[in-house]
C-alpha cells in the first residue's frame, strides 16, 4: 500500500514533547496582573477615605468607636456594685441583735436609773460587770429608758392640761368680787368676771 504524504521534517513535532502552548498562554496575563498589583495596588473606596483622613481625625474615630464599649463596661460595673450594696447580705449586716434582760437585771438597772439617769463611766463599767453585758449595751439601755421616761411625762402632761383648762373656765365663770361695804353697812360695789376675763363692776 502507498504511504500517505509525509510532513516536512522541519514541521514535524516530536510526540514525546508535551505541548504547553495552551497552558502557558493564560498564565502570562495572570503573572502580569500580579506584577501590576505589586507595583500599583488596587485602590478601594475605603482605602481612599482612610488615606485622606489626617492623624487627629483617625484618633477621633478610634475614640468614638471605643467610647460605647467603655461606657457599657462602666454601667456593668456600677450595676454589680449596686447589687452588692442592696443585696440581702447588706441588709443582714445592719441588723442589730436585741439584748434581752431578765427581771432581776431590769430591776437593778431601773433602781440605778431612778437614782441617776445619766451615769458616769465608772458607774457604767460597774453595771456592765454586774449585769453581764457590755458598756455599749448599758448606754443603749439608759438612752432608751430616758426616751421612754420623756414620752410618759408628755402623755401625763397632755392628760392634765385638758382638765386644768376646763376647771379654769369654770372658775373664771363663777368668780365674783366680794361685796365691799362702807362704814355705814351699805354696799358700795360688787363685780363679776365675764367670759373675756375682764371684771365688771356694779357700783351703787
From Swiss-Prot:
Keywords: Developmental protein, DNA-binding, Homeobox, Nucleus, Transcription, Transcription regulation. It is found in: Nucleus. It comes from the Eukaryota. The keyword Transcription applies. Residues 94-153 bind DNA. The keyword Transcription regulation applies. Residues 37-54, 62-72 have a biased composition (Polar residues). GO terms for molecular function: DNA binding; DNA-binding transcription factor activity, RNA polymerase II-specific. One of its GO terms (cellular component) is nucleus. Specifically expressed in oocytes and early embryos. Disruption phenotype: No visible phenotype; mice are viable and fertile. Female mice lacking maternally transcribed Obox1, Obox2, Obox5, Obox7 as well as zygotically expressed Obox3 and Obox4 are infertile: embryos arrest at two-four cell stage due to impaired zygotic genome activation (ZGA). Pfam families: Homeodomain. Residues 28-73 are annotated as: Disordered. One of its GO terms (biological process) is maternal-to-zygotic transition of gene expression. PANTHER family: HOMEOBOX PROTEIN, OBOX1-RELATED. Transcription factor required for zygotic genome activation (ZGA), a critical event in early embryonic development during which the developmental control passes from maternally provided mRNAs to the expression of the zygotic genome after fertilization. Together with other Obox family members, required in early two-cell stage embryos to kick-start the major ZGA wave by facilitating RNA Polymerase II 'pre-configuration', during which RNA Polymerase II relocates from the initial one-cell stage binding targets to ZGA gene promoters and distal enhancers. Belongs to the paired homeobox family. Obox subfamily. This is Oocyte-specific homeobox protein 1. It comes from Mus musculus (Mouse). The gene is Obox1.
